[in-house]
Amino acid sequence: MPISQWPPLRVPPGAMGWVLPQFEQVSPMQVLVFALLGLIIGSFVNVLIHRLPLMILRADMASDHSSDVSTTSSAEPCLGLSTPPSHCPLCEHRLHWYELIPVLSYLSSFARCRHCKGRIAWRYPFIEITTSLLFTLCLFQFGWTLQALMACFFTAALLALAWIDAETFLLPDVITQALLWVGLIGSAMSLTPIPLIQALSGAVLGYSILWAVSWIFATWRGKEGMGQGDLKLLAALGAWVGVWSLLPLLLMASVSGLIFGVIQKMRGQLGDNGHFAFGPFLALSGFACFFLGISMGV
């Protein structure tokens, strides 16, 4: 029987409706499409995670040494999201098309570069599989709709931001600003569950709250306690979850971040300055508020 004729997924009545309202309405073909789309987008998320911090670093170095820009650009190859083509980060061997197939290429090469035999980071298949699972979750939550695709964009952007921040303490503007504007435009077009006025209020208040916290901390302690990227991320999240979800979102992020910080401090892995990335906790809490509809009940 062709896959397009497979019957819809069936579960006991009401078993999943409380959290995944569209679970019983989607077909296996639709699940397959979203799962494959997740693998493909997950591969692109890996590109963002690897290249965006390097691009930001090079841009900062170029601005610090503006007189040497021509020398630097001639000495180093142009770096973008599509240039140079995908290659091994160890030996810079250009990858063939069959070495770019999500997950399968990693497994078939036994997690090693086919050219230099260097080990490939486990992050690559992990991100691809995670994105695929999250995209499938979006389908179960919103069904075969444009809203599901919007939710896929939301989850992929948060995954990229969380991982980049955890590794580099950076939250690239190109992603946070895209997240903000897509959220606002999607709300205006009724492609997200949040009315436009709540999305606008959430974005403004989200930025303002963390700006106030950051200003108070800097005035009190005489040093910066929160990066500008966190402010922009909460503004973007506010556009997606609305103003009434900001307080629960901040509470969840703060509590989970505090627990993580205490554990890292006890293990002696927090560092002398006591800093750790807050973006992943904002991203995870924003994801929970968006998909579970967590708000102040207004």
Model-identified regions with their sequence ranges:
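Interfacial loop-to-transmembrane junctions
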Residues: G227-K232, V262-A288
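Multi-pass membrane catalytic core of lipid/isoprenoid biosynthesis enzymes
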Residues: E92-Q147, A151, D230, A235-A236, ...
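Functional transmembrane core segments of multi-pass inner-membrane proteins
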Residues: F34, Q147-S256, V298
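Juxtamembrane boundary at the C-terminal end of a transmembrane helix
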Residues: F291-V298
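C-terminal ends of transmembrane helices
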Residues: N46-R51, F110-G118, L158-L170, W211-E224, ...
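Membrane-proximal soluble regions of multi-pass membrane proteins
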Residues: R51-R123
